[in-house]
């Protein structure tokens, strides 16, 4: 599908909101109900960022970032994910996936930032792990030594903030 069914786990009734109408389906509840008896993965796009939503044990949505980055204006997407595409490997009921950044090897799965790089969390080391989902565990290692688990938060990627705030570069002529 192109437009995401929902961007949160919470199953709320559709509410007309002009700013959000392009990011959700009017009939997402009916679609999710129809898929309830099956183990299903929805693959969507449209938003130019990665977002995985686990609705329940049988239904997950993968909103995959764009191969065009920020509408061909930058090599990254709005969430800091490099432009690229999703790879999905299906073997019977077993589904595995990862995000493949264009021009990088498969192993290129995150960007890290030192203390002070984030305005939102200036005293923290930040890792933007593209295609993350809530079933993953993200750990901080330094020189091969486990330093601890990282805490998830939703915020701005420092590099994407710089790139996307350049108004002259991001002007669209369409």
What is each of the regions a protein language model found here?
Residues 59-143, 173:
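Binuclear metal-dependent phosphoesterase catalytic core
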Residues 40, 127-129, 152:
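A composition-driven signal for long, intrinsically disordered, charge-rich low-complexity tracts
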């Amino acid at each position: 599908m192109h437009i995401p069914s929902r961007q949160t786990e919470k199953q709320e009734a559709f509410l007309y909101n002009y700013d959000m109408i392009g990011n959700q389906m009017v009939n997402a509840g009916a679609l999710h109900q129809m898929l309830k008896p099956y183990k299903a993965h929805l693959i969507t796009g449209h938003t130019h960022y990665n977002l995985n939503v686990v609705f329940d044990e049988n239904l997950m949505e993968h909103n995959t970032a764009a191969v065009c980055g920020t509408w061909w204006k930058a090599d990254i997407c709005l969430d800091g994910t490099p432009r690229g595409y999703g790879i999905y490997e299906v073997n019977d009921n077993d589904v595995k996936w990862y995000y493949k950044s264009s021009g990088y090897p498969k192993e290129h799965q995150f960007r890290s930032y030192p203390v002070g790089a984030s305005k939102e969390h200036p005293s923290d080391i930040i890792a933007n792990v593209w295609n993350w989902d809530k079933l993953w565990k993200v750990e901080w290692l330094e020189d091969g030594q486990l330093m601890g688990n990282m805490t998830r938060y939703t915020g701005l990627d420092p590099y994407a903030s710089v790139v996307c705030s350049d108004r002259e570069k991001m002007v669209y002529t369409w």
